[in-house]
Amino acid sequence: LSNYQQNFLSKEHPELVEDVQSAVNSDAVFAPILGIYVMGSFGSISQTSASDLDIWICHQDDLSEQEQQRLAEKTKKISQWASTYHVEMHFYLMTQQRFRNERYSDPLTKENSGSAQYMLLLEEFYRSAVRLAGKPLLWLHLWVEDEKQYEAEVARLVAAGELNPNDWVDFGGLGQFSASEYFGASLWQLYKGIDSPYKSVMKILLLETYAQEYPNAQLIARQFKEDLLSGHSTAIHHFDPYIAILERISQYLTAHSEFKRLDFVRSCFYVKATEDFALYHASNWRISYMKMMAQEWGWSKERIEELDQRPNWKIKRVKESHNNLVNFLMMSY
């Protein structure tokens, strides 16, 4: 136990200190939680003070229904506690077999895409996940040329004694993409666009890019892994998932000479990344990066100032922006 944990127990639950310390020191203690990971915009240039936190909790496969319910109740209480600090947290309970079953059993909700996207959700997780606690993710450390051979390669390494699966969390490879998933994921982004239109513009166009490359989509998650394992630190994406999305979209639209859409996407990216710039010092890395990008795009000072004045836009300008967003989303869909 850390000093903080020991002090907390001593003050709040002194009667439990001895039992908890004994359990922690026991080799036979059962650890139901294998790993905790946050995904999405966390740590990226698009994260703002209003961004929510999507947290995956990977637990043992054999937890009873009652144990899963108790774990879910605990995450609910943590979410309620976080809300008192104006932080929105969403927890998702996962097992390592979740994506191998080729079915996403949870129903469609405001924060859960259900079966609308399957491999695409896992790909987003791999390209943006940050490990908070627990075991590292095997997929991020194991390079396989053909994703369809990922499971076979893992089995080979385990059989050869070169890999201990108990040291890792493994949600599986990205070799089971289906064309229908792009349709479901696009619908989901249209729905999410109601609350987060600028982010949805980026994501739905990435789906369009992937769909054009199907069945050999050049996944950002694989690009990140290849760069990491090869020691190649590229100045293009900085291992930032949203900068990488913009780069891929830009390559796709430029190749198709769709410069009007490219310009609109850049505007959406700028707006999303600068939503709370008033909170930051002028030397903040996000401000410096966006200024550099705007200069590379050839934007005028007037255009930048106009976008920076979004909170003061008149109703006519707001309506125009909304209509442009809706038209763009529908065109990409």
PLM region spans:
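Nucleotidyltransferase catalytic cores
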Residues: L1-E15, N101-T109, Y126-Y333
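Conserved structured core elements
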Residues: F30, S49-A50, E65, Q69-A72, ...
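Short, conserved secondary-structure transition motifs
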Residues: V87-T109
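Acidic, Ser/Thr-rich peripheral helices and adjacent loops at domain boundaries
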Residues: T109-Y118
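Catalytic micro-motifs at enzyme active sites that drive phosphoryl/nucleotidyl and oxygen chemistry
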Residues: A23-D27, G35-Q47, I78-A82
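E2/UBC-UEV (E2-variant) core
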Residues: R70, K74-H90
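Helical scaffold of the NTase/Pol beta-like nucleotidyltransferase catalytic core
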Residues: L1-G35, E67-E73
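Catalytic metal-binding acidic patch
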Residues: I45-Q69, E88-F91
